Amino acid sequence: MLNFEHNLLYYNYRFSHLKTAKAHGLVAPHKPLLLLAVMELVEAGKIDSPRIMLSDELVSTFNHNAQFYDPEVEHYHPNIGMPYYHMHSEPFWRLVPREDGVTPNVTSISGLRHHYLYAEIDKELFSILFDVESRVSLQTTLIETYLKHD
């Protein structure tokens, strides 16, 4: 149990310190929105392994979250390709290239699907997402850190 709690603290820290773009004094919400979408699909049983496919359902959930949390955003447009690719700068997210090994900096959905099989999150993080209290803790961290507007 101690290791599980240690891991939850680690991922709460990582989630509250994401490397995000900034423009006009605002933090880009894309990475938090993507992580929230992943958590929703894990909870719904639509993602059942640490492999995060760039599925139509993930795209739809991301877009729904973008509209829900930031409906009037002016400086950022919800493009899941940006965070899906740039999440590789986070220590818990890896892009898995296709067999040709070509790994270009591509952020279009079609380009990502062409060059990458999937993204993979840490197994420890995936396990944490199955625990309701832990998942809520991580969701709260993302919302309060990046998406809560006064």
What are the roles of these predicted feature ranges?
Residues M1-D150:
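Intrinsically disordered, charged low-complexity linkers and terminal tails
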